[in-house]
Amino acid sequence: ENLQTVSYSDLWSKIQMTGKALSVLEKPENPPIIGLLTYNQLNGVLVDLACLSFGFRVIPIPLNSTNEHLSFILKQSKVTHLFVGGKTAIRLWNDVQPSHTISVIAFNNPNLIHGNVTEWNTFFDNRDRAQNFNVNQRMSYVSVDSTQTIMYTSGSTANPKGITFTQKNLISKRFARALALPEFGSDDTFLCYLPLFHTFGRYFELMGSIFWGATYSFAESPAFNSLLKDFLMVNPTIFISIPKRWVQLYEMLEEQLDLDSDDSDII
């Protein structure tokens, strides 16, 4: 029930350290391509933001992928290093592992993961081996027009389709969203459960929070009752959701309140 908080200053420090650790994976003429197969968690965000900050191509992979689609994504995007977190991700990877020669970094339970596995703390501690990692220089080298990240559709009708994004795409999306929602700002608190492998969760909630200087709060679970508890702890001003959750909220409130009342105090 304890809330753990991270300031923007601490976040940027952790992103830089993660970038250093990622740079250790580099080989001459063979930059690492990073895959993310995980539930929403801080360490996954650190990897994603470090990749975007320092020019490592990163591919968030839907957790609802089939084995066939996961293999397709890994092969098409040429992932060299896959960060894996959570039971669903571990099961998916273990099922396809024999078909791939990919290095795995385990966010948790490395002993349950098949293949060439490095534990997160080992990966993170390797940042001390980074050579010539100058933060400002690395950022200045990042191309605004090269493919920076690929996001895949669910592949419900055929193989998943990869949508490529450059840094310029990410920036233009960010400013367009901000122009459409000028009321959002640094006083806002997001409660977020939408997956970070989808555009709304990743671009609107996560990167939007950073752009606005708002507070991004990880929901403990997407389950309705769990979200209700998170509402009480976090007191969000912004909550983005699928229609089903709004219907559930309305029905719950309708049971407890007279929503047709003219008395605003009742509501």
Q: Which role fits each region the language model picked out?
A:
Residues 87-144, 253-267:
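ANL superfamily adenylate-forming
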Residues 12-17, 130, 144, 163-183:
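Conserved structural elements of the adenylate-forming
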Residues 48-54, 76, 207-211, 250:
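Short hydrophobic alpha-helices that are characteristic scaffold elements of the AMP-binding
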Residues 3-5, 19-65, 193:
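Conserved AMP-binding/adenylate-forming
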Residues 171-189, 196-267:
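Conserved AMP-binding/adenylation subdomain of ANL enzymes
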Residues 38-39, 56-75, 86-89, 216-234, ...:
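ATP-dependent adenylate-forming carboxylate-activation enzymes
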Residues 128-152, 159, 183-189:
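Conserved pre-ATP/AMP-binding loop-to-beta segment of ANL
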Residues 5-9, 141, 148-174:
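Conserved AMP-binding A3 loop
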